[in-house]
Amino acid sequence: MSIDDLKSKIPDFAKDVRLNLSSMASDETLTPQQKYGLFVACGIASRNADVRKALVAEAAAKVDASVIQAAKSAASIMGMNNVYYRFVHLATNKDYRTMPAKLRMNVIGNPGVDKIDFELWSLAVSAINGCGMCIDAHEDVLRKANVTSETIQTAVRFASIIQSVAIALEAADTE
């Protein structure tokens, strides 16, 4: 499945989503590794098979397999961290904030690609998963590495578009 196939599946009630997907696909403001890593990580985080397949296929044609693997790692590790740290952040019992997480997350320190790109993907997945604590942590690392607000905003915009594509396809499935 390709992005064009994905666009063709988006119904007219979600025309804005389809147009945003087209804009995202042609956007060249990020490096190819940043862009296609976002496609993979956010496609997986969307939990929609069609979205995941189309975006992974698009990325596989554009970047090295190590980028695909690292983006898969970002989606996977954020799937764990976003649940845990969202709980820690939202729980009224603040004792959880001082307890060790006891979760392996070595991939964050050694993702196999540029660490800043991995942080950007992790931020975008954290936005999809709604973990404010993780969003703040990843945004802080990115800002300290002099990543611009525009780059960060673009990553989150891509995440929002990818998530909206998944939702539009789910909504179309109800017709």
UniProtKB/Swiss-Prot annotation:
Keywords, alphabetical: Antioxidant, Disulfide bond, Oxidoreductase, Peroxidase, Redox-active center
Gene Ontology molecular function terms on file: alkyl hydroperoxide reductase activity; disulfide oxidoreductase activity; hydroperoxide reductase activity; peroxiredoxin activity
Coiled coil (UniProt feature): none
Keyword field contains Cell membrane: no
A Pfam family per the record: CMD
One GO BP: response to oxidative stress
Family recorded in the similarity comment: Belongs to the AhpD family.
PANTHER family: ALKYL HYDROPEROXIDE REDUCTASE AHPD
Record protein name field: Alkyl hydroperoxide reductase AhpD
Organism: Brucella anthropi (strain ATCC 49188 / DSM 6882 / CCUG 24695 / JCM 21032 / LMG 3331 / NBRC 15819 / NCTC 12168 / Alc 37)
